[in-house]
Amino acid sequence: MALWGGRFTQAADQRFKQFNDSLRFDYRLAEQDIVGSVAWSKALVTVGVLTAEEQAQLEEALNVLLEDVRARPQQILESDAEDIHSWVEGKLIDKVGQLGKKLHTGRSRNDQVATDLKLWCKDTVSELLTANRQLQSALVETAQNNQDAVMPGYTHLQRAQPVTFAHWCLAYVEMLARDESRLQDALKRLDVSPLGCGALAGTAYEIDREQLAGWLGFASATRNSLDSVSDRDHVLELLSAAAIGMVHLSRFAEDLIFFNTGEAGFVELSDRVTSGSSLMPQKKNPDALELIRGKCGRVQGALTGMMMTLKGLPLAYNKDMQEDKEGLFDALDTWLDCLHMAALVLDGIQVKRPRCQEAAQQGYANATELADYLVAKGVPFREAHHIVGEAVVEAIRQGKPLEDLPLSELQKFSLVIGEDVYPILSLQSCLDKRAAKGGVSPQQVAQAIAFAQARLG
């Protein structure tokens, strides 16, 4: 059933109808459309369009339809309706007859779809926040269990300084906490109702839009009808949050893919999140992580696509805005799936402490400690940096770690070096000295875990 046929003397070409119709994707707004229609029916009572009895009849029919949709959502796609609004209205008329045709009084699909989409966004943000916090909790638990797992930290993918696996986990907790904050901020800005703004100029009925917003669970009503029906900032904000969040998950995946290689060997992934090869029987591939990394690109694409769609649109509503949904639905679905999968990866991960320790002892990760030692002895840092560089070259030549060079060898580079240097060069000393806030010392890591646990509840 088309909602606009009176103006036209010819039927739409079937090819145009297929091109124009949006039911194949906006069916996902069915529940929100019905909830919005119930609230609108209440508003129509306040301005005398509906009687209380008529409203009750409409609300009952809409609630029955809501339960029917929840029980069998696939029925929507069996229809040839143009969009979800047409489908809901058609089903309502089937149930209550002519009364159903009164519901759209004073309402446009422009404010209707804007309301539906915001309601869907609110519901989905709630799911994303839950999944985000679950992954944070999984990371914190993994950190708590691996505070003593010393491993090399990297810059330029070269061993740099020793850290712990716990400290690595907590780095991603910080990223996810920022993602959580971005979602909460976006939620505040989208929590305003456009319903009652009509096509673009507002409704001719003196509806209390603040009351209507409250019935729908919004914090308030929007202030400008032109902006309200054409605003898709909330779509851009959520796509941006998803794009950033997926970058974080992609980096998380890349780190673990590397840690899981035979060359690194720091972790073993569970069989539950890996697959094999059809040819090579020895293979155990990190498919879950590779897919997280790969899916990052489609989310970035959705954000870029939506920005390009909106950038040249004049006020107010344009059919281009129908393109807001598919990318948004896919991007947020993808982000949600990847958050769940990342938590599943952590659920069965095994940290190989001996191999982590061995790798941390290689690569001269304690070179900075020797430089700091020289500074403490009064050597200017730039000179100390040069001295340690020369000592590392000699250690490499001899195939030894710095701490295995005899004192006589070390003193060739600086006479201030004494026997007290050797405790300084131990991995534990390297960790203990990083005791400033945010550092890798055991005390700081324990405090960071406690802080995260308290924040996450």
Curated annotation (Swiss-Prot):
It comes from the Bacteria. Pathway: Amino-acid biosynthesis; L-arginine biosynthesis; L-arginine from L-ornithine and carbamoyl phosphate: step 3/3. GO terms for cellular component: cytosol. Keywords: Amino-acid biosynthesis, Arginine biosynthesis, Cytoplasm, Lyase. The keyword Lyase applies. Its EC number is 4.3.2.1. GO terms for biological process: arginine biosynthetic process via ornithine; L-arginine biosynthetic process. GO terms for molecular function: argininosuccinate lyase activity. InterPro entries: Arg_succ_lyase_C, Argininosuccinate_lyase, Fumarase/histidase_N, Fumarate_lyase_CS, Fumarate_lyase_fam, Fumarate_lyase_N, L-Aspartase-like. The keyword Cell division does not apply. PROSITE patterns: FUMARATE_LYASES (PS00163). It catalyses: 2-(N(omega)-L-arginino)succinate = fumarate + L-arginine. SUPFAM superfamilies: L-aspartase-like. Pfam families: ASL_C2, Lyase_1. PANTHER family: ARGININOSUCCINATE LYASE. NCBIfam families: argH, PRK12308.1. Belongs to the lyase 1 family. Argininosuccinate lyase subfamily. HAMAP family: Arg_succ_lyase (MF_00006). This is Argininosuccinate lyase. It comes from Escherichia coli O127:H6 (strain E2348/69 / EPEC). The lineage of its organism: Bacteria, Pseudomonadati, Pseudomonadota, Gammaproteobacteria, Enterobacterales.
